[in-house]
């Protein structure tokens, strides 16, 4: 969700923050994870500030805290419309400072496992076309979700979720998809929720402000049910407006809207997925039950599902959850690596050979027959928007499952046979991953015969007593 970082910096303790998170999550949040994450939020924020995050401040010099949808108190700190970018830059600086090697243009093809224990991975160097293996004591899957299935873009293709799925790891809570309420109608431009904590108001069709009591997903669903809404930013002060200069520029250049004079039409779209690779409080991947972990495998970020968010996301918890899960998984992986030995050389060798064969087979089958990966993605987005949108039903989900299966069986044209910098091949691999995770999410939505959080079934309009 596009917003700052929630913490109880302005409260006596984190109890209400935790309660708000549980309430938004509709009884599907994991209590220990919620307590540890909300309880450590202030320290995470302080650490980022120490590393150089230039937080917006109030008149007393304290971090400015905005009250966003689903928050019982002002709780969200940030840097206006650039919080995510600033946090990413600061974390990259810390990687450089610590001489942590990073490699780009690497596509992970497979995780190598034996007896529920990670041995390494096989990857493709996109720049050179080389397929290589890395033996590892611990592996952290820190990745995005799979919301590209709805949006038709390549920002979140579910690659890590697909890697886990191929190894027989059951994914969790895939039926829950968060929609961003402040999306400009007929565009993909998502405005930060922080605007609502700085004087912005969502106006319904009746001309009255819409409720922000029940969280951003509830607000998004209300907007969709009403056929749209408008965002009024005319009451944002001049001092606050300086923190949203990018918003003003994007609205003017992309939509021709001056928010100081005109209201902004809204229509929510899928913004992030909540489910993914199930993890415990320490980021260890679990499979088949919360007491059964996969040795050496960890997950963090949007690819992970620690059940922090439950059935719906609350304001300010998205970035907080990513930071907290990254720290937990990284620390646990380091501990694992320090006490383990390398193993699985023969399994890695076999996996490497199989990857070479698959790669050569895909490149040798280039030709004009079939459709492009982009066409597949566009068709998938149409299917997901139609049948896996705000309201779902058994008949619609059955149609979605059949459509995705047909897309998986469709021949895809690959015109470039060169192994070097073959971005067309990479897009095909990612599209295959996205299809597999999208199929699993439709199955999960079909299996949950109730309405809970942001999963709404028109044929099961109420929720079960037991989640």
Predicted regions: what they are:
Residues 138-189, 307, 315-332:
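Glycine-rich loop(s) and the adjacent beta-strand/alpha-helix scaffold that form part
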């Amino acid at each position: 969700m596009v917003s700052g970082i929630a913490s109880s910096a302005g409260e006596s303790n984190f109890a209400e923050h935790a309660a708000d998170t549980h309430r938004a999550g509709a009884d599907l949040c994991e209590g220990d994870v919620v307590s540890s994450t909300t309880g450590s939020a202030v320290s995470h924020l302080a650490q980022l500030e120490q590393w150089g995050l230039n937080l917006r401040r109030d008149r007393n010099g304290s971090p400015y805290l905005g009250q966003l949808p689903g928050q019982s108190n002002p709780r969200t700190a940030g840097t206006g419309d650039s919080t995510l970018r600033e946090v990413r830059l600061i974390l990259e600086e810390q990687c450089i400072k610590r001489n942590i090697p990073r490699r780009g243009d690497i596509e992970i093809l497979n995780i190598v496992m034996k007896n529920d224990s990670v041995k390494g991975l096989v990857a493709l160097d996109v720049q050179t076309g080389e397929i290589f293996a890395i033996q590892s004591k611990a592996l952290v899957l820190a990745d995005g979700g799979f919301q590209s299935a709805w949006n038709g873009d390549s920002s979140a293709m579910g690659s890590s979720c697909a890697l886990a799925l191929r190894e027989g790891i059951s994914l969790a809570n895939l039926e829950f998809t968060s929609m961003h309420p402040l999306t400009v109608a007929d565009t993909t431009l998502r405005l930060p929720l922080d605007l609502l904590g700085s004087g912005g108001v969502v106006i319904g069709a009746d001309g009255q402000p819409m409720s922000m009591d029940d969280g951003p997903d509830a607000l998004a669903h209300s907007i969709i049910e009403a056929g749209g809404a408008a965002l009024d930013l005319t009451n944002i002060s001049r001092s606050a407006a300086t923190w949203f200069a990018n918003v003003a520029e994007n609205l003017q250049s992309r939509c021709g809207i001056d928010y100081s004079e005109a209201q902004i039409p809204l229509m929510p779209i899928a913004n992030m997925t909540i489910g993914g690779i199930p993890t415990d409080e320490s980021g260890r991947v679990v499979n088949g039950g919360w007491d059964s972990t996969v040795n050496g495998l960890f997950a963090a970020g949007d690819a992970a599902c620690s059940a922090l968010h439950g059935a719906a996301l609350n304001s300010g918890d998205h970035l907080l959850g990513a930071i907290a899960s990254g720290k937990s998984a990284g620390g646990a992986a380091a501990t694992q690596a320090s006490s383990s030995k390398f193993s699985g050389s023969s399994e890695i060798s076999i996996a490497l050979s199989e990857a070479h064969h698959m790669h050569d087979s895909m490149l040798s089958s280039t030709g004009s027959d079939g459709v492009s990966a982009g066409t597949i993605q566009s068709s998938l987005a149409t299917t997901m928007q139609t049948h896996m949108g705000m309201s779902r039903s058994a008949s619609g989900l059955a149609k979605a499952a059949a459509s995705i299966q047909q897309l998986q069986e469709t021949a895809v044209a690959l015109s470039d046979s060169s192994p070097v910098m073959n971005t067309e091949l990479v897009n095909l691999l990612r599209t295959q991953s996205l299809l597999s995770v999208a199929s699993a999410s439709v199955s999960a939505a079909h299996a949950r015969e109730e309405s809970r959080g942001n999963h709404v079934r028109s044929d099961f309009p109420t929720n079960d007593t037991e989640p």
